[in-house]
Regions:
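Short loop/turn motifs at secondary-structure junctions
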Residues: 23, 284-285, 302, 338
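Conserved active-site beta-strand-loop modules that form the wall/rim of enzyme catalytic pockets
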Residues: 147-149, 204, 304
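Conserved S-adenosyl-L-methionine
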Residues: 172-298, 321
């Protein structure tokens, strides 16, 4: 079976390495994703265990779609009875335009009509449209008048780990945070017993993702929804086995004792980080506290990783105050962490 894993820009090599670790073969890297081959188990493992992927897609058909009629016919060439069970719900995501399909909403409607018309004709029933957590989410990409129709096995973006109860302004996406931790060498540092410190932790994403990594916790294990659960081709026994395996690995990983801390001057951010950590079932594993950057010291020893996402862009605020923040951060790094 052939699949496609979408991912953030600049992360494809990390995603490809993860996929190969899950058993994928013939991985091909693109700017924002990885094409790969594997069994359904490989795809399920990617949904459950990938720390960097955004979505896992199962391509069903690729065809010329110069206009709406060609799009409709191409979508109808797929046997939807093999994928959408009776009384299921359906959503369509459509990306891309062309001279004669100039709006994504129009493309999505045409795709939906083709699917619904086929199912009504063959089964006498039609799926209901449900934008939020449907049984089956169909993904259509239109590029240079060629359409690729896929099933979205993830259902919603895999960066949504289900632990973020509250966020802060412009939070870092979880899969991007995980990729940055990988680039910084955190897995090897954690394996050697090193510490993790984020002195500007916001809602705690770096520390929580670092803990999930260090303790061998599947990032998708907290999620209650995946796009394949309502799919007619879903293998329930296989998924149950993978969930049980993830539970056993989580229990084994809890024996690891590492110092993983996050500080922030904002009391609201710290409350959010603590709540997020509790939802991730990391109470007593990670530590968050309100602490000003000016009093930052190294009380974690000489082996570890300091990582931070300082304010920029949407979070820039007062530019003069920001200059002071960066100056203080540089001073504390030179003083305590060289």
């Amino acid at each position: 079976m052939q699949f496609f894993a979408s991912c953030p820009l600049g992360v494809a090599d990390l995603t490809a390495a993860e996929l190969r670790n899950f058993g994928a073969s013939r991985t091909s890297e693109y700017k924002r994703g990885v094409q790969f081959e594997g069994t359904l188990e490989v795809a399920y493992r990617a949904c459950l265990w990938s720390r960097t992927a955004s979505r896992i897609l199962l391509p069903l058909a690729t065809f010329p779609a110069p206009d709406a009629d060609a799009l409709y016919a191409g979508v109808q060439s797929v046997d939807w009875t093999a994928h959408i069970a009776p009384r299921s719900t359906l959503a369509v995501e459509f990306a891309g335009t062309s001279p004669r399909i100039s709006h994504t909403h129009f493309g999505a409607l045409k795709t939906k009509d083709a699917i619904v018309d086929q199912l009504r004709e063959r089964t006498g029933e039609r799926p209901s449209i449900e934008v939020d957590r449907p049984s089956v989410r169909v993904d259509v990409r239109l590029d240079r008048e060629r359409a690729t129709v896929s099933l979205d096995l993830s259902g919603e973006s895999l960066h949504r780990r289900a632990y973020r109860a509250r966020g802060v302004a412009a939070p870092l996406k979880e899969n991007l945070a995980a990729a940055i931790l990988m680039r910084a060498g955190w897995p090897a540092i954690a394996e050697a017993g090193g510490a993790l410190l984020d002195p500007m932790c916001g809602s705690g994403t770096f520390v929580i993702e670092g803990a999930l990594m260090a303790l061998d916790i599947a990032p998708g294990s907290l999620r209650s929804y995946f796009g394949f659960v309502g799919w007619a081709g879903h293998d329930r026994a296989l998924w149950a086995r993978l969930i049980e395996e993830a539970r056993e690995r989580r229990e084994a990983g809890r024996n690891r004792k590492l110092a993983m801390r996050g500080y922030d001057r904002d009391a609201f951010a710290i409350r959010a980080a603590i709540e997020n950590a509790e939802r991730a079932k990391l109470r007593g594993v990670v530590h968050f506290e309100r602490r000003e950057l000016q009093v930052l010291t190294n009380d974690l020893g000489s082996r570890g990783l300091l990582i931070a996402n300082p304010p920029y862009g949407e979070r820039i605020g007062d530019k003069e105050a920001l200059q002071g923040v960066y100056a203080t951060l540089g001073e504390k790094l030179r003083e305590h962490f060289e």
